[in-house]
Amino acid sequence: VSPGYDALQFAIDECHRRGMELHAWIVTMPVGKWDGLGCKQLRKKMQRNIIKIKGYGYMNPETQQTADYLARICAEVTRRYDIDGIHLDYIRYPEELPKLKTMSHDEGRRNITRIVRAISQQVKCLKPWVKMSCSPVGKYYNTKRYWSHGWNAYETVCQDAVAWLRDGLMDELFPMMYFRDNNFFPFALDWKERSHGRIVVPGLGIYFMSPREKNWPLSDITRELGFLRNNGLGHAYFRSKFFTDDTKGIYRFAKNELCLYPSLVPPMTWQ
């Protein structure tokens, strides 16, 4: 239902008025419930390009039609609005896809990279200063000492996010690092070592501090924040509600101890 105004333009204006950047969040592969309005409309437009998994629709990651469609959407947003970035979410194979267990993952990575390349080229052709980013699965791959427990970006869901940085298809990564201890620290360092001079901003699972989730203590998050700062990495929070609600005192910690002074957004020196 239309809110009666341009919601994206409103968000851009309010962010820029406060000295903040606005990155348009684009959900790529999932298209909602199979019988939902949005999924139904897409199925009419591209009947053979929407696949059904457990009652939900997904763009087929293996077709050029998917790459072209998503690239057109991102290009339209870039052309029409004064955005600072395009952020791709769920830019991966659906983990519930049965085919993932038997398919060639090299081919899968090529398919996802083809989509990312199509989007990046369209966006950069229009406005080279617009930042391309995505939120890959929190562990890129196994490290020399630590196993990813079968859940990583590179192999499990065919996200070769490091290659996207290397090849200039992405400017920033926001890996979903909703972990603790040895599931966090070595893998955060691994992202840094593979960053190719680009920006890596690990996302922290502050929602796990909620008693309704895993009831993590604040110290788990503050240790991670200290580690990231000491290693020259940024940080993001998932999700904002738990930050603004000051869950376990995270907002007060950030305001009074971690972020005492304004910080500048890192420049894209490679552009």
Please tell me what each predicted stretch does.
Residues 12, 16-35, 87-88, 108-154, ...:
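Aromatic-lined carbohydrate-recognition surfaces of secreted/lumenal glycan-active proteins
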